[in-house]
Amino acid sequence: FYTVRIPYHEDFERFYAEAHALITDIPEDGDPYGAEKILAEQGDYDVVHLSAVPKMYFTSITYTLAEAGNGCSYPLMTAGKAVSREGRLVFPLSIYVNHAFVDGSHLTSFFGKVEEYLKEISHK
């Protein structure tokens, strides 16, 4: 397990190349939370934590926040294994947010955009 800061790029090929370079350059003896600590020190919370469990299909995920006073100021997401259901490829995507900064309309918009993107790439 390791936290990596991967900058957003509109162009997927550029995003993938940078993500691949960052992920494959993780030191074995490094601090798995080093990137997160640096961001916190800088006051930069413009992040989304995304975990992937590609070998597991799930119906729900529960997150435990161990740090006292942590209001969870960033979304926690988990993507799971894609499976075939009724001739369609589906996968679980869980998101945990603090209602102090995210409303239901934000979640509706987010999942709507995910659905649009998946429809777009499924027709390529």
Give the predicted meaning of each segment.
Residues 86-124:
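C-terminal structured interaction module
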Residues 10-12, 56-59, 83-85, 103, ...:
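A generic structural micro-environment signature
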Residues 4, 17, 58, 70-73, ...:
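Intrinsically disordered, low-complexity linker/stalk segments enriched in A/P/T/S
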Residues 26-27, 51, 75-80, 107-122:
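C-terminal functional regions of eukaryotic proteins
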